[in-house]
Design a protein with these regions (language model features):
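Buried hydrophobic residues that stabilize the cores of well-folded domains
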Residues: 1-279
Protein backbone atom coordinates (compact mmCIF):
# COMPACT_ATOMS: atom_id res chain seq x y z
CA UNK A 1 0.00 0.00 0.00
CA UNK A 2 1.34 3.44 -0.96
CA UNK A 3 1.97 6.09 1.66
CA UNK A 4 -0.77 8.70 1.93
CA UNK A 5 0.52 12.21 1.26
CA UNK A 6 -2.75 14.10 1.70
CA UNK A 7 -6.46 13.63 2.27
CA UNK A 8 -9.20 15.95 1.06
CA UNK A 9 -12.77 15.65 2.34
CA UNK A 10 -15.58 17.21 0.29
CA UNK A 11 -18.90 17.66 2.08
CA UNK A 12 -22.17 17.92 0.17
CA UNK A 13 -25.18 19.13 2.19
CA UNK A 14 -28.51 17.57 1.24
CA UNK A 15 -30.12 20.98 1.49
CA UNK A 16 -30.75 22.02 -2.13
CA UNK A 17 -29.71 25.60 -1.40
CA UNK A 18 -26.22 24.62 -0.22
CA UNK A 19 -23.18 23.81 -2.33
CA UNK A 20 -20.45 21.23 -1.88
CA UNK A 21 -17.33 22.45 -0.11
CA UNK A 22 -13.95 21.18 1.06
CA UNK A 23 -14.44 20.59 4.78
CA UNK A 24 -11.11 19.06 5.75
CA UNK A 25 -7.58 18.70 4.39
CA UNK A 26 -4.90 16.59 6.06
CA UNK A 27 -1.25 16.44 5.02
CA UNK A 28 1.19 13.69 6.06
CA UNK A 29 4.94 13.20 6.01
CA UNK A 30 6.52 9.95 4.81
CA UNK A 31 6.34 8.52 8.33
CA UNK A 32 2.57 8.89 8.45
CA UNK A 33 2.62 11.86 10.82
CA UNK A 34 -0.03 14.56 10.37
CA UNK A 35 1.92 17.71 9.56
CA UNK A 36 -1.05 19.96 8.74
CA UNK A 37 -4.82 19.85 9.26
CA UNK A 38 -7.16 22.43 7.72
CA UNK A 39 -10.87 22.47 8.53
CA UNK A 40 -13.71 24.55 7.08
CA UNK A 41 -17.31 24.96 8.26
CA UNK A 42 -18.55 25.99 4.81
CA UNK A 43 -17.31 27.00 1.36
CA UNK A 44 -14.23 29.12 2.10
CA UNK A 45 -15.27 29.54 5.76
CA UNK A 46 -12.20 28.95 7.93
CA UNK A 47 -12.68 26.87 11.07
CA UNK A 48 -9.25 25.70 12.19
CA UNK A 49 -5.69 25.13 11.04
CA UNK A 50 -2.93 23.24 12.85
CA UNK A 51 0.62 22.62 11.65
CA UNK A 52 2.97 20.18 13.37
CA UNK A 53 6.69 19.51 12.97
CA UNK A 54 8.48 16.32 14.00
CA UNK A 55 12.11 15.37 14.58
CA UNK A 56 13.87 12.31 13.15
CA UNK A 57 12.48 10.20 15.99
CA UNK A 58 8.91 11.19 15.02
CA UNK A 59 8.55 13.27 18.17
CA UNK A 60 6.67 16.56 18.08
CA UNK A 61 8.98 19.58 18.15
CA UNK A 62 6.58 22.36 17.10
CA UNK A 63 2.80 22.90 16.98
CA UNK A 64 1.19 26.01 15.48
CA UNK A 65 -2.53 26.79 15.66
CA UNK A 66 -4.08 29.59 13.62
CA UNK A 67 -6.86 32.14 14.13
CA UNK A 68 -7.41 32.22 10.38
CA UNK A 69 -5.51 31.17 7.27
CA UNK A 70 -2.46 33.28 8.14
CA UNK A 71 -2.60 34.69 11.68
CA UNK A 72 -1.09 32.59 14.45
CA UNK A 73 -3.15 31.94 17.58
CA UNK A 74 -0.40 30.03 19.37
CA UNK A 75 2.91 28.39 18.58
CA UNK A 76 4.63 25.90 20.86
CA UNK A 77 8.24 24.80 20.35
CA UNK A 78 9.27 21.70 22.30
CA UNK A 79 12.88 21.36 23.47
CA UNK A 80 13.79 17.76 24.28
CA UNK A 81 16.68 16.21 26.18
CA UNK A 82 18.85 13.33 24.95
CA UNK A 83 16.22 10.84 26.11
CA UNK A 84 13.62 12.56 23.98
CA UNK A 85 11.65 13.92 26.94
CA UNK A 86 10.35 17.48 26.77
CA UNK A 87 12.22 19.72 29.20
CA UNK A 88 11.19 23.15 27.90
CA UNK A 89 8.34 24.60 25.84
CA UNK A 90 8.58 28.04 24.24
CA UNK A 91 5.09 29.49 23.67
CA UNK A 92 4.26 32.40 21.35
CA UNK A 93 0.79 33.99 21.38
CA UNK A 94 -1.17 35.94 18.78
CA UNK A 95 -0.43 39.31 20.44
CA UNK A 96 3.30 38.71 20.22
CA UNK A 97 3.78 37.88 23.89
CA UNK A 98 5.72 34.80 24.87
CA UNK A 99 5.95 32.45 27.81
CA UNK A 100 8.17 29.54 28.74
CA UNK A 101 7.22 26.27 30.37
CA UNK A 102 10.00 24.40 32.17
CA UNK A 103 9.54 20.77 33.10
CA UNK A 104 11.43 19.65 36.19
CA UNK A 105 11.79 15.95 37.02
CA UNK A 106 13.25 14.11 39.98
CA UNK A 107 16.12 11.66 39.51
CA UNK A 108 13.79 8.65 39.37
CA UNK A 109 11.33 10.32 36.96
CA UNK A 110 8.55 9.81 39.51
CA UNK A 111 7.47 13.46 39.57
CA UNK A 112 7.15 16.32 37.09
CA UNK A 113 6.72 20.00 37.86
CA UNK A 114 5.58 21.97 34.80
CA UNK A 115 6.08 25.67 35.48
CA UNK A 116 4.96 28.30 32.97
CA UNK A 117 6.18 31.90 33.25
CA UNK A 118 5.57 34.93 31.03
CA UNK A 119 8.20 37.18 29.47
CA UNK A 120 8.37 39.18 32.73
CA UNK A 121 9.23 35.97 34.59
CA UNK A 122 5.86 36.03 36.35
CA UNK A 123 4.15 32.74 37.11
CA UNK A 124 1.33 31.91 34.69
CA UNK A 125 0.48 28.40 35.84
CA UNK A 126 1.93 25.26 37.35
CA UNK A 127 1.13 21.59 36.98
CA UNK A 128 2.48 18.90 39.28
CA UNK A 129 2.34 15.22 38.29
CA UNK A 130 3.29 12.15 40.33
CA UNK A 131 3.86 8.76 38.65
CA UNK A 132 3.84 5.19 39.92
CA UNK A 133 6.64 2.69 39.30
CA UNK A 134 5.16 1.86 35.87
CA UNK A 135 5.25 5.51 34.79
CA UNK A 136 1.50 6.08 35.00
CA UNK A 137 0.20 9.32 36.49
CA UNK A 138 -1.38 8.80 39.92
CA UNK A 139 -1.72 12.48 40.88
CA UNK A 140 -2.16 15.61 38.80
CA UNK A 141 -2.45 19.04 40.45
CA UNK A 142 -3.20 22.31 38.65
CA UNK A 143 -2.20 25.69 40.10
CA UNK A 144 -3.00 29.27 39.02
CA UNK A 145 -0.75 32.33 38.65
CA UNK A 146 -0.77 32.78 42.45
CA UNK A 147 0.46 29.19 42.78
CA UNK A 148 -2.88 28.31 44.37
CA UNK A 149 -4.39 24.90 43.74
CA UNK A 150 -7.40 25.06 41.39
CA UNK A 151 -8.17 21.36 40.94
CA UNK A 152 -6.56 17.94 41.19
CA UNK A 153 -6.97 14.43 39.80
CA UNK A 154 -6.10 11.15 41.53
CA UNK A 155 -5.83 7.90 39.55
CA UNK A 156 -5.74 4.23 40.55
CA UNK A 157 -4.85 1.30 38.28
CA UNK A 158 -5.62 -2.41 38.28
CA UNK A 159 -3.08 -5.23 38.04
CA UNK A 160 -3.12 -4.97 34.22
CA UNK A 161 -2.14 -1.29 34.33
CA UNK A 162 -5.59 -0.06 33.29
CA UNK A 163 -7.09 2.91 35.07
CA UNK A 164 -9.70 1.69 37.57
CA UNK A 165 -10.60 4.84 39.52
CA UNK A 166 -10.29 8.54 38.67
CA UNK A 167 -11.12 11.17 41.28
CA UNK A 168 -11.64 14.83 40.41
CA UNK A 169 -10.95 17.10 43.40
CA UNK A 170 -11.64 20.80 43.95
CA UNK A 171 -9.25 23.50 45.19
CA UNK A 172 -9.70 22.23 48.77
CA UNK A 173 -9.03 18.64 47.66
CA UNK A 174 -12.65 17.71 48.25
CA UNK A 175 -14.23 15.22 45.90
CA UNK A 176 -16.14 16.58 42.90
CA UNK A 177 -16.53 13.39 40.91
CA UNK A 178 -15.34 9.80 41.23
CA UNK A 179 -15.25 7.63 38.12
CA UNK A 180 -14.89 3.84 38.13
CA UNK A 181 -13.81 1.77 35.11
CA UNK A 182 -14.64 -1.90 34.47
CA UNK A 183 -12.95 -4.06 31.81
CA UNK A 184 -13.44 -7.38 30.05
CA UNK A 185 -10.95 -10.26 30.24
CA UNK A 186 -9.37 -8.91 27.04
CA UNK A 187 -8.88 -5.44 28.52
CA UNK A 188 -11.72 -3.73 26.67
CA UNK A 189 -13.63 -1.07 28.59
CA UNK A 190 -17.12 -2.33 29.53
CA UNK A 191 -18.41 0.28 31.95
CA UNK A 192 -17.49 3.76 33.11
CA UNK A 193 -19.55 5.16 36.00
CA UNK A 194 -19.20 8.63 37.56
CA UNK A 195 -20.69 9.65 40.93
CA UNK A 196 -20.60 12.94 42.82
CA UNK A 197 -19.35 13.40 46.38
CA UNK A 198 -22.72 12.28 47.78
CA UNK A 199 -22.51 9.05 45.81
CA UNK A 200 -25.28 10.07 43.41
CA UNK A 201 -24.95 8.84 39.84
CA UNK A 202 -23.69 11.59 37.52
CA UNK A 203 -23.31 9.71 34.25
CA UNK A 204 -22.24 6.38 32.83
CA UNK A 205 -20.96 4.80 29.63
CA UNK A 206 -21.78 1.17 28.85
CA UNK A 207 -20.04 -0.56 25.92
CA UNK A 208 -20.90 -3.87 24.23
CA UNK A 209 -18.64 -5.84 21.85
CA UNK A 210 -18.97 -8.58 19.24
CA UNK A 211 -16.90 -11.77 19.06
CA UNK A 212 -14.09 -9.84 17.34
CA UNK A 213 -13.92 -7.42 20.29
CA UNK A 214 -15.32 -4.60 18.16
CA UNK A 215 -17.65 -2.05 19.73
CA UNK A 216 -21.23 -2.72 18.61
CA UNK A 217 -23.13 -0.55 21.08
CA UNK A 218 -22.39 2.41 23.36
CA UNK A 219 -24.92 3.85 25.78
CA UNK A 220 -24.32 7.21 27.46
CA UNK A 221 -26.35 7.47 30.67
CA UNK A 222 -29.18 5.63 28.94
CA UNK A 223 -30.00 8.80 27.00
CA UNK A 224 -27.76 8.57 23.94
CA UNK A 225 -26.96 5.35 22.13
CA UNK A 226 -24.55 4.54 19.29
CA UNK A 227 -24.85 1.27 17.35
CA UNK A 228 -22.15 0.01 14.96
CA UNK A 229 -21.85 -2.56 12.15
CA UNK A 230 -18.64 -3.74 10.44
CA UNK A 231 -17.64 -5.35 7.18
CA UNK A 232 -15.64 -8.59 6.95
CA UNK A 233 -12.37 -6.62 7.17
CA UNK A 234 -13.39 -4.91 10.39
CA UNK A 235 -14.17 -1.51 8.89
CA UNK A 236 -17.17 0.28 10.45
CA UNK A 237 -19.81 0.52 7.71
CA UNK A 238 -22.87 1.64 9.68
CA UNK A 239 -23.20 3.92 12.70
CA UNK A 240 -26.60 4.83 14.12
CA UNK A 241 -27.04 7.58 16.70
CA UNK A 242 -30.11 7.73 18.97
CA UNK A 243 -31.52 10.10 21.56
CA UNK A 244 -33.75 7.76 23.50
CA UNK A 245 -35.66 5.83 20.82
CA UNK A 246 -35.33 8.58 18.20
CA UNK A 247 -32.65 8.19 15.53
CA UNK A 248 -30.65 11.41 15.19
CA UNK A 249 -28.28 10.24 12.50
CA UNK A 250 -27.28 7.23 10.42
CA UNK A 251 -23.84 7.06 8.86
CA UNK A 252 -22.93 4.52 6.18
CA UNK A 253 -19.34 4.27 4.97
CA UNK A 254 -17.58 2.68 2.00
CA UNK A 255 -13.90 1.72 1.71
CA UNK A 256 -11.42 0.90 -1.03
CA UNK A 257 -9.34 -2.28 -1.30
CA UNK A 258 -6.84 -0.84 1.20
CA UNK A 259 -9.57 -0.13 3.79
CA UNK A 260 -9.29 3.61 3.22
CA UNK A 261 -12.65 5.29 3.61
CA UNK A 262 -13.84 6.78 0.30
CA UNK A 263 -17.40 7.89 1.03
CA UNK A 264 -19.74 8.56 3.90
CA UNK A 265 -23.47 9.19 3.79
CA UNK A 266 -25.37 10.83 6.64
CA UNK A 267 -28.92 12.10 7.05
CA UNK A 268 -28.07 15.73 6.33
CA UNK A 269 -24.97 15.50 4.15
CA UNK A 270 -22.53 13.18 2.41
CA UNK A 271 -18.74 13.17 2.29
CA UNK A 272 -16.21 12.15 -0.35
CA UNK A 273 -12.64 11.27 0.63
CA UNK A 274 -9.84 11.76 -1.91
CA UNK A 275 -6.22 10.75 -1.38
CA UNK A 276 -2.86 11.74 -2.82
CA UNK A 277 0.02 9.30 -2.39
CA UNK A 278 3.79 9.56 -2.25
CA UNK A 279 5.64 8.22 -5.29
Amino acid sequence: MSLVKSLRVTTTPKDEDSESYISREVFYDRNGNEIAVHEYRGAGEFESKVETKFNEANQVIEVTTYLDENDIAERKVYIRNQEGKVEKVNIEFTDGTVSVQLIERDAENRTENRIERNEDDELESREFIRFNAEGKAILRELYDFNDKLTEAFESEYNSDGEISVLRHLDDRRKLILETEFKYSDTGSLLLRVSRNRRGDLSDFLKIEYNDQDQVVRQSFSGKYTFVYEYDELGNPIVEEEFSGDVMDNRITSEYDANSLIVSEDQLKFSKRFEYEFYD
